[in-house]
């Protein structure tokens, strides 16, 4: 008779979970950050708020963002004027948009990842879908399964309302699934659309205005599996270690609340300080076992958040400017896409491999993927690059 331990042993993969393919997508509507304040105050009928507009202009100028992509166009906003007010009941209008567009944008990213993977979609065994943009039943995971034509018995996991740290959370979950289910191939999708948070300005809620200056739309997908098939699957990054923690004394630092007016956004001014204060301990727990204490010796995949956060983290750790360059490039080209950001960054690193590098980690062996968001919660993923 076979023992339980023998069954468990047979169920486990031999090697570490590995990212096998990456895909990203954005809506076609591209917004120029330099002209966005004029557009934003005009479309929300707020041009009379001249002092607040000047303040918003400064926010946009300091954001280090050049452009963002948004599903919500001027035409859509004219059809749904309640979304342009600061606090008008508008959840129905927002939900009508996101329950359709979140899975649709996720599909675009997933199709690209599956194509790069090169295997039939019938080999996908698990699906993880993550979004902070709306809630519905059946969820976006179900809708994506239908849109992609995945097998009806694919094992699905739906993650709603996680926020900006979730790009690390989904990889942590995918790692556990891949390593504990021999032969598993996990499709991971993060899809974010700002239709749920867009609203007009208010001089009493400046942190909401910060969100209007930073957030953009995007979807990202990865295929994760252990024991890549030689000559068929191309390993990109191994997921070696993961952790999540709540930063002490950080309650209320970043909050989002779903209301009749949509998803409201709140953050404290000291978010950059809280993140930089706690990142050292998180990195120490991750890299001390590897005898790594020089964080300039690893490659970085950091959630961009905003320029002030990146500046304080770099200063705290003594990072060279090039360590955060790719993160700043993603912020510049796309804005803050919440959970999707870190995968866009991974995709940029993968593309740079074609430029004569020896490993998928910019010629470095080890790397960190670092995310932070509501809670304030921190996600840490240790990555191991793969020889090209």
Swiss-Prot record:
State the source organism's domain of life.
Eukaryota
Q: Which residues form the active site?
A: 164
Q: Which UniProt keywords apply?
A: Acyltransferase, Flavonoid biosynthesis, Transferase
Give the reactions, separated by semicolons, that this protein catalyses.
(E)-4-coumaroyl-CoA + 3 malonyl-CoA + 3 H(+) = 2',4,4',6'-tetrahydroxychalcone + 3 CO2 + 4 CoA
One GO molecular function term of this record is:
naringenin-chalcone synthase activity
The UniProt entry, under Pfam families, shows: Chal_sti_synt_C, Chal_sti_synt_N
Q: What's this protein's function?
A: The primary product of this enzyme is 4,2',4',6'-tetrahydroxychalcone (also termed naringenin-chalcone or chalcone) which can under specific conditions spontaneously isomerize into naringenin.
Name the record gives this protein: Chalcone synthase
Per the UniProt entry, what species is this protein from, by scientific name?
A: Vigna unguiculata
């Amino acid at each position: 008779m076979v023992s339980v331990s023998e069954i468990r042993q047979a169920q486990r993969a031999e090697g570490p979970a590995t990212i096998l393919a990456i895909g990203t997508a954005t809506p076609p509507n591209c917004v120029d950050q330099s002209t966005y304040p004029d557009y934003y105050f005009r479309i929300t009928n707020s041009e009379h708020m001249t002092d607040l507009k000047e303040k918003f202009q400064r926010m946009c100028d300091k954001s280090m963002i050049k452009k963002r992509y948004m599903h919500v166009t001027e035409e859509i906003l004219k059809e749904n004027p309640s979304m342009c007010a600061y606090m008008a009941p508008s959840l129905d209008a927002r939900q009508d948009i996101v329950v359709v567009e979140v899975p649709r944008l996720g599909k675009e990213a997933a199709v690209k990842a599956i194509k790069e993977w090169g295997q039939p979609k019938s080999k996908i065994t698990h699906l993880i879908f993550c979004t902070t943009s709306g809630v519905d039943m059946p969820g976006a995971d179900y809708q994506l399964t239908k849109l992609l034509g995945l097998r009806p018995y694919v094992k699905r996991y739906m993650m709603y309302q996680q926020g900006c740290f979730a790009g690390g959370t989904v990889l942590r979950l995918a790692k556990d699934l891949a390593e504990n289910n021999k032969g598993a191939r996990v499709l991971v999708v993060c899809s974010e659309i700002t239709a749920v948070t867009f609203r007009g300005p208010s001089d009493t809620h400046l942190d909401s205005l910060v969100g209007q200056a930073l957030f953009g739309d995007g979807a990202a997908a990865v295929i994760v599996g252990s024991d890549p098939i030689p000559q068929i699957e191309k390993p990109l990054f191994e997921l070696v270690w993961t952790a999540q923690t709540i930063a002490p004394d950080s309650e209320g630092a970043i909050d989002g609340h779903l209301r009749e007016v949509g998803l409201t956004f709140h953050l404290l001014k000291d978010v950059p300080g809280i993140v930089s204060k706690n990142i050292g301990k998180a990195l120490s727990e991750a890299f001390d076992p590897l005898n790594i204490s020089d964080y300039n010796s690893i490659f970085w995949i950091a959630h961009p958040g905003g320029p002030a956060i990146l500046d304080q983290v770099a200063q705290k750790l003594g990072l060279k400017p090039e360590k955060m360059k790719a993160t700043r490039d993603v912020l510049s080209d796309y804005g803050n896409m919440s959970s999707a950001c870190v995968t866009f960054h991974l995709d940029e690193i993968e593309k740079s491999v074609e430029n004569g590098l020896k490993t998928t980690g910019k010629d470095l062996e080890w790397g960190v993927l670092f995310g932070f968001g509501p809670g304030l919660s921190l996600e840490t993923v240790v990555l191991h690059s793969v020889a090209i």
